[in-house]
Amino acid sequence: MATIAPYELGDWLRIEPREVEREALKEIADPEVYFVAGPSFTIKDDGSPVVCGGIHIRGDGGGDAWLFASTWIERHIMVARLVRDFMLAVVDDYQLKWLQVIVDTRFPKTLRWLGWLKFTYWASLEHRAKYHIYRRKF
């Protein structure tokens, strides 16, 4: 049975990442520092982490959303609802005006999921053509 709990240091290390996460790790010097830079959560299945996510709170009224998941996420629609509810609660608690996420465009499932969460294309990263920024205003 899946449960959601506050993120604990090292939870992400116990997840067998999907290809999209393995690619993202190549771009992040120290993921743990980023993962604890704001409210975050871990979804566990039978006590083992399968999804971690959170929002890095910025000083300009916005936040950077992140998600680190195993293939488990693709079999459980309830994760989308949990992530949406977490996101909306953080936006409300911190009175955020917008959220953004950097997306590897080679993974269409991620783009569809962001559409469901009402994020839209905002910009491309000049130095990394395969990455786009998607944003949602509140």
Walk through the language-model features, giving the residues of each.
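Conserved acetyl-CoA binding element of GNAT-fold acetyltransferases
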Residues: D60-E74, H132
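C-terminal "cap" of GNAT-fold acetyltransferases
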Residues: H127-F138
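Conserved beta-strand in the GNAT
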Residues: T42, G47-I57, G62-W66
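Conserved glycine-rich acetyl-CoA-binding loop
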Residues: T71-D85
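A short helix-loop-beta-strand connector motif used in the catalytic cores of GNAT acetyltransferases and
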Residues: E32-T42, S48-V51, Q95
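Conserved acyl-CoA
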Residues: L82-W98
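Short amphipathic alpha-helix that is part of the acyltransferase structural core
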Residues: M1-A29
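Conserved beta-strand-loop-alpha-helix junction that forms the acyl-donor binding cleft
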Residues: L96-G115, L125-R128
